[in-house]
Design a protein with these regions (language model features):
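Conserved acyl-donor/pantetheine-binding loop and adjacent beta-alpha core of acyl/acetyltransferases
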Residues: 22-76, 139-141
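Conserved GNAT acetyl-CoA-binding A-motif
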Residues: 71-73, 100-113
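A short helix-loop-beta-strand connector motif used in the catalytic cores of GNAT acetyltransferases and
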Residues: 1-5, 21-26
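Conserved acetyl-CoA-binding loop-helix of GNAT-fold acetyltransferases
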Residues: 76-79, 85-102, 121-125
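C-terminal "cap" of GNAT-fold acetyltransferases
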Residues: 71, 113-117, 126, 136-157
C-alpha cells in the first residue's frame, strides 16, 4: 500500500515501504520469511548464525506499538545519506500520507530509536508525535549500548 521510490538522475535515493493495515503486513512478512529462512540456513546470505541471532533478538525484544484501530498503517523510510537534508524524506512522507488519506486510513505508526536524531526531526516536522518509548537491549550487541525504541504516530482523519 502506498510504496514509493525517490530517484535522482536515474539513481534511487530513497524509498518508503508501507502497509495500510497490520494483518497484510504480518502476512507479507511471514511469506517472505518462509522464503528466506531456508536460504539463510544454507548460507546464501553469508554465515547464518549472525542473521539467526538478529531474528531471535527481534522476537525477544519487540518495540512498543500503537493501537492498531487508530494507527493501522505502518511505514519504513530510508533516504541515502548523500540525499538527506535535501527534501527527499519530506517529499516521500508527504506523498505517502496523501495516499493513506485517499485510502481512508485513520492513522499511521512507525518505529525508530532516540539515537536517530535526523529522522526524529523529520517526523516531528511532518506532524508525527511520540506515542510510546521503551529502553531496549536489542541494539546493544551491535552498538555497544542499549537504545530507546520509540513508536511515532500521526492521525490522518
Amino acid at each position: 500500500c502506498c510504496n514509493l521510490v525517490a530517484e535522482e538522475e536515474g539513481r534511487v535515493v530513497g524509498y518508503i515501504l508501507g502497509a495500510c493495515a497490520d494483518r497484510p503486513l504480518a502476512l507479507a512478512f511471514a511469506k517472505r520469511l518462509l522464503w528466506a529462512l531456508p536460504r539463510l540456513l544454507l548460507g546464501r546470505f553469508g554465515p547464518p548464525l549472525p542473521h539467526l541471532r538478529y531474528l531471535l533478538r527481534l522476537l525477544r525484544y519487540p518495540g512498543p506499538k500503537a493501537p492498531k484501530d487508530r494507527y493501522p498503517a505502518h511505514l519504513h523510510i530510508a533516504v541515502d545519506p548523500e540525499a538527506q537534508g535535501h527534501g527527499v524524506g519530506k517529499a516521500l512522507l508527504a506523498a505517502f500520507l496523501k495516499c493513506l488519506r485517499e485510502k481512508g486510513v485513520p492513522g499511521v505508526q512507525l518505529a525508530t530509536t532516540r539515537a536517530n536524531r535526523a529522522a526524529r526531526g523529520l517526523y516531528r516536522a511532518m506532524g508525527f508525535r511520540v506515542y510510546a518509548k521503551r529502553a531496549s537491549p536489542f541494539w546493544a550487541p551491535y552498538l555497544g549500548r542499549p537504545l530507546i525504541h520509540e513508536v511515532w504516530v500521526r492521525d490522518l482523519g
